[in-house]
Amino acid sequence: MEKVRQVVAYQNHFEYFLKKQPVKVQNKIFKIIEAIETLEKVPANYLKSIRGTKGLYESRIKLGTDIWRVFCFFDKGKLVILLNGFVKKFQKTPKKEIEKAERLMESYYADKNKS
């Protein structure tokens, strides 16, 4: 399949999160990343904007009754930046996880503006 956008990880937060997950979860995450890269319109059950943030999205991973989230955002429309992930244990996404992702997004833009 041809890619319509590029997905990259910022720093090592996503990689660290990914390595701690079971292989089945890693495979599901890779499948969703592939969908984000290749589908022009990504289904909301894979990628959803987070209300109350400035451009933050969460990639949604479900396997059985367990749920994982990976935060990301778009840079220049076709570049998706993966930030951090967590295991979701409550209905609502924890505010501290959103705040961490927002700090990472700010850090990404600060680093980008330096170069």
State where each predicted segment sits.
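RNase H-like polynucleotidyl transferase catalytic core
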Residues: 86
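ATP-dependent carboxylate-activation loops
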Residues: 83
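Basic, Lys/Arg-enriched alpha-helical interface segments
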Residues: 1-67, 76-80, 89-115
